Structures are given as C-alpha cells and as structure tokens.
C-alpha cells in the first residue's frame, strides 16, 4: 500500500576515516493509501508515460510512471510558463523518483516535451547503475 516516507538526502554521516559517526533514521507512516489504490495510481501514471503526454519519459526496457505539468505564470498572457515532469521507476516496484522543473522554457513549453526527456536521460543512466534489470513488459496489466 502507500506509506508516507520522509524525503531525505543522507543515511549516514562518516568521519574522515570513512567510519560511520551517525546513522540517520526517518519515520515511516504506514497505511495512508490502500494497496488497491496504490496499484491503480501506479497503473494510471504508467499509462501517462506509455500512451499519454509523458511519452518522452519512456525508457527502453523499463516501466516508468509519471505526470506532466504545464502552467502559465502571472501576469496572464505574458507568454511565460513552468514546465515539469515527475517520474518514478520501475513502475511496478518504484526505487527512484525524480522531478524536472523548467522555469520559462524557450520555444516549446509543454512539460511532456521539455521536462520529460530530462528524466528519461537521467533514468537511462541511473537505472542500469542501480543494477535494475530490464523487462520485456512495458506496461502493467489494468487492475
């Protein structure tokens, strides 16, 4: 199901000799979303990447879920936008989440066109680095 995990950037503090000085712990609040709801949301967000506006976030051999966003900044009519894409992979067992936010992109300004390719490039490098195996399945079955 869904667990709330505190975002964090480190798990240990090391001294100059590389020995652990402190191990950080982060609270996990369990059961905030049912397993069924979590699976449904993963499926919907995976479809955004496989068939929708997030297609530029697809990574060959990996299942990726995500959401694009495009917003106009004030004042309205200024022609200024914020484009973004948040993605997670592998979609069936998320290990990595990343977001790209582009403030006032030039030319094309849609999140799926501007920000999703950034996450794709990141995942093309980081997923193999993490030792995650490619899959033949590109999309999970509907629940």
Segments and roles (model prediction):
Residues 1-29, 36, 45-131:
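Active-site beta-strand/loop architecture of penicillin-binding DD-peptidases
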Residues 133-143:
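Short, highly charged C-terminal tails/helix-capping segments
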């Amino acid at each position: 199901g869904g667990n709330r995990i505190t975002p964090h950037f480190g798990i240990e503090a090391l001294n100059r000799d590389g020995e652990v000085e402190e191990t950080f712990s982060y609270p996990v609040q369990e059961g905030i979303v049912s397993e069924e709801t979590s699976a449904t949301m993963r499926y919907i967000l995976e479809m955004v990447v496989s068939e929708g506006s997030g297609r530029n976030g697809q990574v060959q051999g990996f299942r990726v879920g995500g959401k694009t966003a495009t917003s106009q900044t004030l004042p309205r009519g200024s022609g200024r936008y914020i484009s973004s894409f948040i993605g997670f992979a592998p979609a069936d067992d998320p290990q990595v989440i990343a977001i790209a936010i582009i403030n006032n992109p030039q030319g094309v300004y849609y999140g799926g066109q501007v920000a999703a390719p950034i996450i794709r490039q990141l995942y093309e490098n980081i997923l193999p680095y993490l030792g995650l195996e490619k899959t033949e399945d590109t999309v999970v079955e509907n629940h």
